[in-house]
Design a protein with these regions (language model features):
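Hydrophobic alpha-helical membrane-association signature
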Residues: 35-39, 90-93, 195, 236
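Terminal peptide-recognition signature
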Residues: 20, 24, 39, 57, ...
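Glycine- (often His-adjacent) and acidic-residue-rich active-site loop
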Residues: 44, 59-100, 228
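C-terminal alpha-helix plus adjacent terminal tail
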Residues: 1-15, 172-178, 197, 201-266
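Crotonase-fold acyl-CoA enzyme core
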Residues: 99-212, 246, 251-254, 260
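Conserved CoA-thioester-binding segment of acyl-CoA-metabolizing enzymes
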Residues: 1-60, 99
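Hydrophobic alpha-helical segments typical of transmembrane helices
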Residues: 86, 93, 97, 152-155, ...
Length: 266
């Protein structure tokens, strides 16, 4: 069953899987104020919906997302202060969206069927997992326009090694799916007619795990990455103890010892 939300379409193709599909092909699925607002609203709602175990971000058309809408940015220059108040609002909103994806207790998968540039590439780098078509391409081309991709850089440098990130940022060149997988920007790529099924299969596999364990694990993953080695082990040791005291962990261990499938809480 589909729920039309203008430029964002949501459906539940498998149990526990919420798919959010950007459908503003005229703008190249740009991360406009409206698109980001709808994504933020949908992800916030999914975060507290127990029926949602995992989220897929996908798109219609040959462009996953072209980044911010440059026509809107140009028009904003006609406003007060050469558009500075609008620019601040736009990038604050984008930062909020990216942080929401990271802080969402549900894993978020990017399904990239085409081109992802600038903030669109940033969104790919921000997602927990990313799967692309073999024809997909990625770039942070702002430098070609005299506008360095500084905010996409935040996500990019957390997804790939510095030298690879700097090469993308300084040249603005496209990389293909083979290179994107090689540097760690995406997990894997498939032929376009296989992409949806492969992504859904992975999403379903994760959706069948303990929601509690997945949520705790995702939070711990990003939290410990900011710590030094000793702090990280101290923090994750406490998380392991807390996790062991949860009912799902008790059930999972018991099921393993009894050689049966665990019955986790829904």
């Amino acid at each position: 069953m589909k729920n039309e939300m203008n430029i964002l379409v949501s459906d539940t193709p498998r149990e526990g899987v919420l798919r959010l599909v950007m459908d503003d092909q005229k703008s190249g699925n740009a991360l406009s104020e409206e698109m980001m607002s709808k994504l933020i609203k949908a992800i916030k709602k999914a975060s507290v919906d127990d029926s949602v175990k995992i989220i897929i971000l996908a798109s219609e058309g040959s462009i996953f997302s072209s980044g911010h809408n440059l026509k809107q940015i140009t028009n904003a220059r006609e406003q007060s202060e050469d558009g500075e108040p609008y620019f601040k609002q736009l990038f604050d909103q984008c930062s909020s969206l990216m942080q929401l994806v990271v802080n969402c207790p549900k894993p978020v998968i990017a399904q990239i069927s085409g081109i992802a540039t600038a903030a669109g590439c940033q969104l790919v780098a921000t997602c927990d997992l990313a799967y692309a078509s073999s024809s997909a391409k990625f770039a942070t081309p702002g430098v070609n326009l005299g506008l360095f991709c500084s905010t996409p850089m935040v996500a990019l440098t957390r997804a790939v090694k510095n030298k690879h990130a700097m090469e993308m940022l300084l040249t603005g060149d496209f990389i293909d799916s083979i290179k994107a997988k090689e540097i760690g920007l995406i997990n894997n790529f498939y032929e376009i007619d296989e992409l949806e099924k492969e992504t859904l299969d992975i999403a379903s596999k994760i959706a069948n795990k303990s929601s509690m364990a997945v949520s705790m694990g995702k939070n711990a993953f990003y939290t410990q990455s900011d710590y030094d080695l000793a702090e990280a082990y101290d923090f994750t040791s406490k998380v392991m103890v807390e996790n062991l005291l949860k009912d799902d962990a008790k059930e999972g261990i018991k099921a393993f010892l009894e050689k049966r499938k665990p019955n986790f809480k829904k």
